[in-house]
Amino acid sequence: MTPILRVWSRWLIPVLLLALAAALVMVNRSFVEAAPARNDFTARWEGGHSWISERVSPYDPSVSLQAQERVYGRPANERRGEDPLHFLYPLPALIIFAPLGLLEFELAHAVWMSVLEICLFASTWLWCGTLHWKGSGWMTAALLGFTVMWFPAFESLVLGQFAALEALLLAAGLTAVLARRESVGGLLLAAALLKPQLGIGLVLFVTWWAIFSGRRQLVGWLATGVALMAGLSLLLDPGWPMQMIRQVFDYLGLAVILSPVARVSESLGLGQAGTLAISAFLLAYLFWEWKGSLGGEERRFLWTAALTQAIFLLIVPFGIVSNLVLLLFPILLIVGAWYGRLGRSVDAPAMVLLALLASASWLLSIGSLEQSEPSFWVLFGLPLLTIGGLLWVRWWSTRAQAWSELGAPLL
């Protein structure tokens, strides 16, 4: 390449990327302007806007009321089960939402949707790299299509859910951990606690694994990240933890706070005791797998991390369909192990499997959309199906000496 072409490419590529990003925002803005503002992003934008523009706490009741007026055109009727649209995130999350609060709502929503779309693709790319798996061109295209077209991803984008960004933070964090970039991995995993119920499982597992694997620097950087977020946010607003807890209490009578396990227990008439018993059983089994993962081996670490992700999606509160985008990691691990075992011959079956999974997620969710209630079969069924898939590939994923040996014949 000549020096002139080198200079042109150095400038042209960033310009093209910026042009593509601007086009994506414009397309998303057209969608936002045609769609009602009944999405989760409304409450987060109101919180960021009030804090950055008016210096009003995002937990102030007036901020929730503004979000309710934007969504319902009136105050929420909690007796009907309407979401009070509280900010409901830890104060450090303002590092994401405050800059968006500087933009008018429609533009901010379009920018946020664009960021989430990029996050979904980027997290898929990182997971594939972490698993050392590269499919054929057709398989890659099918996988990228699945990334944004199955129902949890669609709902995450339309509602402006943080789960897509959470997927990227976790993917980047684990990628850095395996590359032994302790500072980057620790800080990214600390940032994953911006949505605590989604990040806590993997953060606890990585901390446990790092302690017993001699990765003290990783633990130190993770603790530093958590301490910085907590300390700086408490300096800005010492009372925010109690204000957030009060907002959580406002959801106690609403179905949205239930975990998938709690929904199952409720439907079976087992009540809170059933929820605690099922959750305790799942956690006990998970802890047993955590103990077996000690030793620092990459294959067992990744498989256990994927299992942790799937199990925690069953037991954490505020179980919503959008959170299931985090299942992409265990799904990729399952398909990757299958692919490594049988080679390119699995292309067609794997693509059919992804198509069936995407179709099922839509078919099972369509009826629930009219009732504004998540599908029980999607919320509970998909994580359970994923756990079954992980158990199916457990031997290949944890006993082979290298990922490349997954294709070796069984003895």
Tell me the role of every PLM-derived stretch:
Residues 333-411:
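Aromatic-enriched
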Residues 188-189, 221-227, 304-310, 347-359:
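Central hydrophobic cores of alpha-helical transmembrane segments
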